Amino acid sequence: MEETLMKKSVLALAALGILAAPAAVIAQVYPAKTVRVVIPWPAGGSNDVVGRIVMQKLSESLGQQFVVDNRGGAAGSIGADVVAKAPPDGYTIMVHSTTHVGNAHLYGKKLTYDTLRDFAGVGMLSAQPGVLTVHPSLPVKTPKEFIALAKSRPGQINYSSSGNGSAPHLQMALLISMTGINITHVPYKGGAPQVTALLAGETQASFATVGTVINHIRSGKLRPLGLGSTKPSKALPNVPTLTEAGVPGYDMSPWIGVFVPAGTPKPIIDKLNAEINKALVLPDVVKSLENQALDAAPSTVDQFNTALKVDYEKYGKLIKLTGAKIE
């Protein structure tokens, strides 16, 4: 009875726009109504799949529906704009990827929001390790051999990406900047044509998320050389990280995480983070993510926000280095 009255009071305050109620009180009964989960990508992609898996668990554990609202377009910036303008009350949250920080540098002043100032990070959901992959016709089996071959054939090896400024483009740009190799970028419009070109031998190398190439690797149609993350991939346990395989310090692993509008009360952020982390260790969630060749990546709020700032700077430097931009 007492909890019901408290929930009604919180909803009344929210309806009146009164945000001065004690944050701890609001968080105690949060969520008191349906939560909108904006996923700024079409249904069926990694962000959507991961978001739905975890948000279903939050619906079950918190007793309110976390309803997905797919708002695709402009590499996630359309949906992000919706969240940036939403009330900071915990009832609009966003599932987005590393693309969020890249967009800040690709779109620049074209964005209607500030990537760091207008959002608060809640926590990471999963890591999407990228893997340096080559067509089997390229006579290399290790990152060191790839680098040596590229140096012996400056400008002759080409690599595909899913577009200018995309994660695969920037992952290779980092490798180029760290090793001094000279290889040619061939951008495609999306991950599917990027991988198709590599399979056909139109391009000879590429970075791709493990999930997009795992079946081709298992069938022998593509050859993995090294992971862009600092941790091994459960889907490719025999593939070393680039740091282990001769490129010390290489670390660029895309992720998927949860955000809220800036100004959302910290107790609500902390509560969401705790529930997300509980969900990420559930055996069925871990298994569902592994089926997508993704690794669960629980984090604290501070760890996630630190990663955001590090990747914001890293992506900014790489985008400036490549000259990539959205016209």
Located regions from the model:
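N-terminal (or domain-start) structured segment
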Residues: A27-D118, Q156-N158, N164, G180-A205, ...
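Bacterial N-terminal signal peptides
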Residues: A12-A21
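An extracytoplasmic/periplasmic, membrane-proximal ligand-sensing/linker region
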Residues: E2, A32-T34, S177-T179, T241-E244, ...
